[in-house]
Every structure is written in C-alpha cells, then in structure tokens.
Swiss-Prot record:
Family in the record: Belongs to the long-chain O-acyltransferase family.
Protein name: Putative diacyglycerol O-acyltransferase MT3481
Molecular function GO terms recorded: diacylglycerol O-acyltransferase activity
E.C. no: 2.3.1.20
Superkingdom of the organism of origin: Bacteria
Ribonucleoprotein is among the record's keywords: no
Amino acid sequence: MAQLTALDAGFLKSRDPERHPGLAIGAVAVVNGAAPSYDQLKTVLTERIKSIPRCTQVLATEWIDYPGFDLTQHVRRVALPRPGDEAELFRAIALALERPLDPDRPLWECWIIEGLNGNRWAILIKIHHCMAGAMSAAHLLARLCDDADGSAFANNVDIKQIPPYGDARSWAETLWRMSVSIAGAVCTAAARAVSWPAVTSPAGPVTTRRRYQAVRVPRDAVDAVCHKFGVTANDVALAAITEGFRTVLLHRGQQPRADSLRTLEKTDGSSAMLPYLPVEYDDPVRRLRTVHNRSQQSGRRQPDSLSDYTPLMLCAKMIHALARLPQQGIVTLATSAPRPRHQLRLMGQKMDQVLPIPPTALQLSTGIAVLSYGDELVFGITADYDAASEMQQLVNGIELGMARLVALSDDSVLLFTKDRRKASSRALPSAARRGRPSVPTARARH
C-alpha cells in the first residue's frame, strides 16, 4: 500500500459530490491500420495493465489493491459516424471527457475509437489527476505500447538553449504530473484569492459538457523561433496561447489588460506558478519576451511546494476555497511535455499522432496542454461546452500567434532592440546621431 500525499488527500476530501468530470486528464493516440478486435485488445490490455502502478488500485486513505479487478469495467468502444474526420474525433474525445470516473473503482478508462478516415483508429487513455503523480496518461499510453517502455516520454526536449536566455526550469519535465501542478497552484491560488482583481474572462459557468480541439505546429518552426530569440519551446507555446486569448477578448469587444488572464504554469515536479498572460501587447516579439522574462522570474522566486508541508485538512480546505472562487479567477492551464524518444507502436501498428488532453478542473474552465510528438508540436484544448462559444477564435489566435513568430524568425528579418540601437548610435559621429531619423522599433527586411 502507498501513502497518500497531502495533495491526493486534499482532493479526495474535496471530491465534487456531483462527480464533476474535469479532474480527468488524458492522451489520445491515432493509430494507423484497422482497429483490433475486442478479444485481441482485451488480451493485450490484460497482459500489460496489471503491471502498471495504480491501474488495479483504488484511492482511500491510501492506495490499496482493488479486489476483483475487472478490465471490462474500464474499456469503452465507440465508432465515429462518417466521414470519420478530425471534427468527429474531437467530438468523441469531448464525449469521453464528459463521463466521470467511478471513484469506487481504479481511476482510469480506455476508449477505443473506430472509424477514423484513412484506415485509422484511436486509443484514448483517461486517468484521474491523483494517479498522475506516479503514472501520467502519456506514460501509461507508452507502457501499453509494444516495447512497454515507460521512459518513452522522458525528458528529451532537444531544444538548444542560447545564452543568456537558457532556463533550466523549463516546464517540460513531464507531460502529465498534473496532480502536483494543479494542486500546488490551487494551494497558492487559494492563499492569494483575496487580492485577485475582478476580471471578465472568456469563460462562463462550469458545465459537465466539453469541447475539444487541437492545433498542430511543425516542430522545426518552433525550433527556429527558439533559436532566433533565445527562448524555450515553453515560451513560444505560451506566447501563442496569449495571442489566442487576446483574439478572444477582442472578438468579444473587451480591451485586453495586463490583469486579464492568469495561467497556471508548471515550473518543476512539485510546484506551479500563476503569471499573467501579457494579452495587452499586440507586438508578438514583446509578448514573447515578456512571457520569457516572467517565466524566469517566477521560477527563481517560487517557494517549495506547499503540498509537501500543508496538513491534509488545510489542503482540502484550500481546494474547497478555490472551488468557490468566481469563475474569472483563473481561466487557463498551460502544461507542456517532451517529445517521445522514439516512434511508438501498438499491436504492431504505428502511432501516427498523439494528442494531449488537459483538464478543466474546478474553476479552471479552459485548459491548454502542449505535447511534442514526431515532427509536430500539438496544442490540446478543452473547454466547457457552453462557456466556449469562442473556441474557434482561440484556435485561430493560437495559429496566428505561431504564424507571426515563425515569420519573424526568418533570417531575413532584423530585429532592433534597445541594445542594438544604442550600439548603432555609438558607431555614428555625434552630428549624424543628432540629425538621423529615429529607428523603427519593429523590424526591417533586407
């Protein structure tokens, strides 16, 4: 038996009596080839699941083995209507997220989704966040693969850091350690709740219905932005997310302000920070620099995780306090992950895509997770169904934010910073400095 952490116990004591489904997180793999038969799938899952921690245990005052574990209670099978395109897949993912996990059984589900176009099928792994401290959804997915290598999603971001902007505390340490990220931020957020400004967010009342969408970006394009500006993939992703929410606010006729949106952002294995997204800036480079600087500053001053030192009952009370906060307190959760070390295969078939699924937990109405797989960086987005009428605006804004940064990362674009302008000024005669026109602050092409 394994002892619960303070965070696990806190969430257990604060469990939503209506079994709100938002505390589930997951990952979806799109697999090439025909879907296996139920008997084939059952044989493989039975063989591989029982060796994975937590998958045959239940959560009480500690993790205990579940008597009479039955795999069939955890496997669901659905078929997409024609044409079986991406939109239908996203609807199926949202449907799976709406179904709450049974707290009296092991806290995970596996959904087999058939009927994808191009002779493909998908497997969705959904777990409760309390399992994520020991086994993430992506790690669980990797353990189900043919090589059963739990290190497939190990830290291997492969982004070269350019001094002096390299940040050892990049938020890519693991994809789905969400129980620690969310709950650590929950405790911090509850303590700061009184000082939060009242803002209008692109979110409304939390419902049990969900929407899901994904945005894909070529990884080479992200790498080019990182090298051009000396930032991390985390910074690039958050800057694109910022453009997405700025687009939503402008679409609603609201003026983006410096205090419009907070984001829960992972900093290490045991803590989280709550910086504001700089939605007030229209200049994409200024947004990127601001995100980078705030990430570094927040990482340096972030204290040790409250979860390691908070009494169980106090942690539960803090979580309850956050649950009662106005919906606009926090509106987005940004997470990230390294790419798998190798191409994954399941039952002899290649995994073509892997999509991350963030939670919309408690009062976090919109979640955005980022995962790198193959040659793509994927933004997975979940939102309350009724509170996400502008989800397409959010998607469009993320795509626009990435497109603007990629265009600016081209080698033919010169960026003029204050240091560059000062150096240029010193190189000119004093008379020329007095008479020359001012240098534009944006960029010049040559």
